[in-house]
Amino acid sequence: MHEDFWQARWARDEIGFHQAQVNPYLSRHWPTLGLAPGSRVLVPLCGKSLDLAWLAGQGFAVLGVELAEKAVRDFFDEQRLIPQVDSQGVFRVYRVGSLEIRCGDFFALSAADVADCRGLYDRAALIALPTEMRERYAAHLSAILPSGCRGLLVCLDYDQTRMGGPPFAVDDHEVRRLLGTDWQVRLLEAPDVLRENWKFLQRGLDRLEERVYRLERR
């Protein structure tokens, strides 16, 4: 999936994946990770998620990574924050206090860039990617994040033959295949939320599970 696809989606404000509130799984399960106050948290493919502001408000240092600069600018505008903007390697960096978003290619992040990250939050990154890119994404996470890093992963699981992605279906088997070697993976909950998501009902789905995982880098 070419980056032009996502740039065009943001340019046209076709961002049905954006949530207008903090994700309830984040607020419910994040405290159970036991991360120390001030820990740095990586949020890949972050868009303009309100979850970034929630994490910062809980006292964490937040490192978001986002390809579309419009999403980054929108985030700070909507939060009524004026960021300091500069360049760091291939990234354009927007920063306010301990909240930082790097605009650029997630795969350009190095282990040195995230060496101090003790947390990971993925609500809509893995499921935004087609099969071959999910392989690359999971491998890159494992390659750059340090041992002991803990986080949450939120996936969708549905019958992919009934609807094309994104968001793509990622079932339990795939999560464990992609991450199980390098991460401890524990399923926290998997509610069927189809009746709460009319647009997916309209597209012919007969189930829509949101699967929430606790991850810890081995």
Swiss-Prot record:
Gene3D superfamilies: Vaccinia Virus protein VP39. Its EC number is 2.1.1.67. The keyword S-adenosyl-L-methionine applies. GO terms for cellular component: cytoplasm. It catalyses: S-adenosyl-L-methionine + a thiopurine = S-adenosyl-L-homocysteine + a thiopurine S-methylether. It is found in: Cytoplasm. One of its GO terms (biological process) is methylation. Keywords: Cytoplasm, Methyltransferase, S-adenosyl-L-methionine, Transferase. GO terms for molecular function: thiopurine S-methyltransferase activity. S-adenosyl-L-methionine binds at residues 10, 45, 66, 123. It holds the Pfam family TPMT. Belongs to the class I-like SAM-binding methyltransferase superfamily. TPMT family. HAMAP family: Thiopur_methtran (MF_00812). This is Thiopurine S-methyltransferase.
